[in-house]
Regions:
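Beta-strand segments within the central parallel beta-sheet cores of soluble alpha/beta enzyme folds
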Residues: 200-203
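N-terminal strand-loop-strand
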Residues: 129-169, 174, 196-197, 220
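Nudix hydrolase/Nudix homology domain
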Residues: 1-111, 166-168, 210, 230-268
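Surface-exposed, charge/polar-rich loops and edge strands
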Residues: 179
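Cys/His-rich short segments
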Residues: 99-150
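Active-site-adjacent beta-strand/loop module that shapes the phosphate/pyrophosphate-binding cleft
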Residues: 206-229
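Hydrophobic alpha-helical positions that pack around
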Residues: 185, 189
C-alpha cells in the first residue's frame, strides 16, 4: 500500500490504524499469533488511555493516527514492543509509518510552548506545524540532518566502535550550522579517526526516528593519515575486508547496514 502524508483529519471515519507509543515502545495487537498495528475506532474503546492524538495520513484506504499512551495498565490482547524490535514483525511500509508517527508524537510533546514568548502553541489544521497565537512563531517537526559514510581503502572498509559499545559501524555525525554535507563528512572523519577522505559520493538517505535524524549516506575513499580514535566518541577503529567483518555490526533496518552490504557486494 502507498502512504499519503496529510495533517488534515477526516470529518468522519469508521476504523483507523493507530500508532500509539509509550516512550520508545509501540502498541501492537496480538491476533492469533500475529503482531499487528491496532486497527480500531479509537484506543479508549479498548481501555487504552492516550493523549496528543495526531492524524498523519492514509495507508492505502486506511486512515492513520498517532498518539501517546498515558496509562500504565496492560490491556488484554495488546502489548508494548520496542520500535527497534518490531521491524521483523510488521511490514517495512508499516515500520516506516511507525517511525514517522513516533517523531510526530514526540514533536507534539516537546513543542507545546513558544520558544520565543512562552505562550501555549496551537496546532495548525492544514499542515504539521505549531503556531504561537501571541507572536505568530511557526514551528515544524524537528529533523536533525546527519551524515553517515562508508570509507574504503584498498578493498577494506573503515569500521569504528564507539565508547561503551560493542558494535562496529561506519562513521557518522550531525551536520553543523553552515556546513555542506561534504564538509560534514570530511570533518567528522577527521575528528573521530584522524584521516582525510576524497571522492565523496551520495549513496542514499533514511529517516531515523530514534534520534529524530535524517541520515544522509555517502561513500568515500581514503586519502591520507593514520587511524587515531578520538577517545571521546570512538574507542577503536580499523580497516576490514569483506570476509573479516566484526560480528557486531548494525542491524538490517539501518542505512549503516546498507552501506556495509554495499561494500561486501562491491569488493567481494
Amino acid at each position: 500500500m502507498t502512504f499519503n502524508v496529510s495533517a488534515i483529519a477526516p470529518a468522519a471515519y469508521n476504523k483507523a490504524c493507530w500508532y500509539c507509543f509509550k516512550g520508545m515502545s509501540i502498541l501492537v495487537a496480538e491476533n492469533g499469533g500475529r503482531t499487528e498495528i491496532p486497527f480500531f475506532t479509537e484506543p479508549s474503546a479498548y481501555g487504552i488511555k492516550t493523549s496528543r492524538a495526531v492524524y498523519i495520513g492514509t495507508n492505502g484506504s486506511n486512515h492513520c493516527f498517532c498518539a501517546e499512551i498515558t496509562s500504565d495498565t496492560p490491556v488484554k490482547g495488546f502489548a508494548l514492543i520496542s520500535l527497534r524490535q518490531i521491524y521483523t514483525l510488521i511490514s517495512s511500509d508499516e515500520f516506516s509509518i511507525a517511525s514517522r508517527a513516533l517523531q510526530i508524537v514526540n514533536w507534539d510533546l516537546t513543542h507545546r510552548f513558544c520558544g520565543r514568548c512562552g505562550s501555549p502553541m496551537q496546532t495548525h489544521t492544514q499542515e504539521f506545524a505549531k503556531i504561537c497565537p501571541s507572536c505568530n512563531l511557526t514551528l515544524y517537526p524537528r529533523i536533525s540532518p546527519a551524515i553517515i559514510v562508508a570509507i574504503v581503502k584498498e578493498g577494506k572498509i573503515l569500521l569504528a566502535r564507539r565508547v561503551n559499545s560493542e558494535m562496529f559501524s561506519v562513521i557518522a555525525g550531525y551536520v553543523e550550522a553552515g556546513e555542506t554535507l561534504e564538509e560534514t563528512v570530511a570533518r567528522e572523519t577527521q575528528e573521530e579517526v584522524g584521516i582525510t577522505v576524497k571522492n565523496i559520493r551520495y549513496f542514499s538517505s533514511q529517516p531515523w526516528a530514534f534520534s529524530y535524524s535524517l541520515m544522509l549516506a555517502f561513500t568515500a575513499e581514503y586519502e591520507s593519515g593514520s587511524i587515531v580514535p578520538d577517545g571521546v566518541e570512538i574507542e577503536e577503529a580499523n580497516w576490514y575486508s569483506p570476509d573479516s567483518l566484526p560480528e557486531m555490526i548494525p542491524g538490517p533496518i539501518s542505512v549503516a547496514r546498507n552501506l556495509i552490504n554495499w561494500f561486501k557486494t562491491t569488493y567481494s
